[in-house]
């Protein structure tokens, strides 16, 4: 089978390509220029070329920087301006990697596209679904929730049945040169955030604009350093007059540059709504597992789909729901779809 492999210049994607080559597939390597300095791109492309030379496969470099900026980067900035907590990776995957890059791969005659994501694909009743990775500590299925079933059918995740701790030893044994490659230490899960998301925002918007802190009764009880520096659940970086116990951000009013704070129990909710992006029309209302944050434990809840909105009801209090985050619905370890929390 002819498969396109997205190569980042790192160990995971290189070993993904190696494992597919060992299975006898015809491969085409693809490096995506999305968002980085030219210096970084040059290094990553050089690393990807070394992997391709070792494997005896061609490498193509696709420049999607303009598309990425308008569809992902600018949306990230806009979401924070609106007081939301966005998920750029969940936006990038369907639009860039499994959108534009997949389209290009198909034009090259490839049947599928592979990446180093920690996830799996499982076919159920002739329909392809994303399945959680074997290594639950590294599972990235959450970020793939917006993919359509027709797209999922064209995906390959060679690392999905492996443990992260085993990848590097396996890769260095198979491709010894990987241990000598130069690289940049990535400090964040978001590729375009070098230090902190605040530093990224500062390049485009006024972040340090002091505002007031209010309690749930609407009374002014303190000040903050600028609403974009806070997310739901944060408990530091603002003042509360006469506070004898911790206070948490429970709401953000972007238009007024105000924070609403309360006690930990005020973070609790028994329901939430999300704008549906990928649950299909045949979705049956019932009890499922949901995630409302990437590194959260799946929580049982009653989920229903009504007029394009996903409605979730919890039996137990659920904490820290932030607008703009992805709500992802699972049946056991099978991802059914999800949406954006409103």
From Swiss-Prot:
Pfam families, sorted: tRNA_Me_trans, tRNA_Me_trans_C, tRNA_Me_trans_M
Cross-referenced InterPro entries: MnmA-like, MnmA-like_C, MnmA-like_central, MnmA-like_central_sf, Rossmann-like_a/b/a_fold
PANTHER family referenced in this protein's UniProt entry, alphabetically: MITOCHONDRIAL TRNA-SPECIFIC 2-THIOURIDYLASE 1, TRNA 5-METHYLAMINOMETHYL-2-THIOURIDYLATE -METHYLTRANSFERASE
CC per GO annotation: cytoplasm
Annotated source species: Helicobacter pylori (strain J99 / ATCC 700824)
Swiss-Prot/TrEMBL keywords: ATP-binding, Cytoplasm, Disulfide bond, Nucleotide-binding, RNA-binding, Transferase, tRNA processing, tRNA-binding
Active site residues according to the UniProt entry: 92, 191
Record protein name field: tRNA-specific 2-thiouridylase MnmA
Catalytic activity: S-sulfanyl-L-cysteinyl-[protein] + uridine(34) in tRNA + AH2 + ATP = 2-thiouridine(34) in tRNA + L-cysteinyl-[protein] + A + AMP + diphosphate + H(+)
Organism classification: Bacteria, Pseudomonadati, Campylobacterota, Epsilonproteobacteria, Campylobacterales
Free-text function comment from the UniProt entry: Catalyzes the 2-thiolation of uridine at the wobble position (U34) of tRNA, leading to the formation of s(2)U34.
Domain of life where this protein originates: Bacteria
Intracellular or extracellular location(s): Cytoplasm
Disulfide cross-links: 92-191
């Amino acid at each position: 089978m002819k498969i396109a492999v997205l190569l980042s210049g790192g160990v995971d994607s290189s070993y993904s390509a190696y494992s597919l080559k060992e299975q006898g597939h015809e491969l085409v390597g693809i490096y995506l220029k999305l968002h980085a300095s030219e210096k970084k791109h040059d290094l990553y492309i050089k690393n990807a070329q070394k992997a391709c030379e070792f494997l005896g496969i061609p490498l193509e470099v696709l420049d999607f920087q303009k598309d990425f900026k308008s569809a992902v980067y600018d949306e990230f900035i806009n979401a924070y301006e609106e007081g939301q907590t966005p998920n750029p990776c969940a936006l990038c995957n369907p639009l860039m990697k499994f959108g534009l890059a997949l389209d290009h791969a198909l034009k090259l005659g490839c049947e599928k596209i592979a990446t180093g994501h920690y996830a799996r694909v499982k076919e159920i009743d002739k329909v392809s679904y994303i399945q959680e990775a074997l290594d639950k500590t590294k599972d990235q299925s959450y970020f793939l929730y917006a993919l359509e079933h027709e797209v999922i059918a064209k995906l390959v995740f060679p690392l999905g049945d492996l443990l992260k701790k085993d990848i590097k030893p396996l890769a260095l044994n198979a491709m010894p040169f990987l241990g000598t490659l130069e690289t940049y230490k990535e400090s964040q899960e978001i590729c375009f955030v070098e230090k902190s998301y605040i530093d990224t925002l500062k390049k485009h918007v006024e972040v340090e604009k002091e505002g007031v802190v209010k309690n749930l009764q609407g009374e002014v009880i303190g000040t903050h350093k600028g609403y974009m520096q806070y997310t739901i659940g944060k408990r530091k970086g603002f003042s509360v007059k006469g506070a004898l116990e911790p206070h948490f951000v429970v709401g953000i009013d972007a238009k007024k540059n105000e924070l609403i704070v309360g006690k930990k129990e005020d973070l609790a909710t028994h329901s939430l709504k999300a704008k549906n992006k990928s649950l299909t029309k045949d979705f049956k209302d019932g009890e499922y597992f949901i995630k409302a944050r990437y590194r959260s434990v799946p929580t049982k809840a009653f989920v229903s789909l009504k007029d394009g909105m996903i409605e979730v009801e919890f039996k137990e209090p659920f904490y820290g729901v932030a607008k703009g985050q992805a709500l992802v619905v699972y049946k056991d370890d099978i991802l059914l779809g999800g949406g954006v929390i409103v």
